[in-house]
Amino acid sequence: MSEIEINGMAHVILTVSRFSEARQFYKSLLPKFGMICVMDGEDFCYHVGGRTAIGIRRCDPEFSGETFQQYRVGLHHLCLRAKSRIDVDRTYKFLNQIKAKIVRGPEERDWAPGYYYILFEDPDGIRIEVNLSLIHI
């Protein structure tokens, strides 16, 4: 047994430069995953559900011209675990409806048994993955 046990990831806060567009994007996407908006302010929006939470925060003014760079120090991408392939496919269908930028998928990969995923971007280009894997953690 490990010395310290954790019980999942409590939350992730994403700092965005296009707050209005990001708020609209996440307020339409996250409820599809069963997440409920519990805070919605001028500079911060926070959804809870699925044993985690996702928040978005307006960036400081001096960073408003910047965009997400996947290979810069910091977040590479955010990945949410689906319960079934159908959920990954439903995510794809919804993303098409809202005209989100889909990077790739849904498709299978050999990274892990049963790995099936879709990768897409929010309005700031932050990459989000929804996946299914037969490896249960």
Where do the model's predicted regions map?
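Long, continuous compositionally biased terminal/linker segments
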Residues: 2-3, 48-83, 89-98
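A short, surface-exposed helix-loop junction/capping segment
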Residues: 4-10
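Core segments of cupin and vicinal oxygen chelate
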Residues: 13-60
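Vicinal oxygen chelate
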Residues: 16-21, 78-124
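Short glycine-/small-residue motifs
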Residues: 129-130
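Conserved small/polar residues in nucleotide/adenosyl-binding loops
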Residues: 135-137
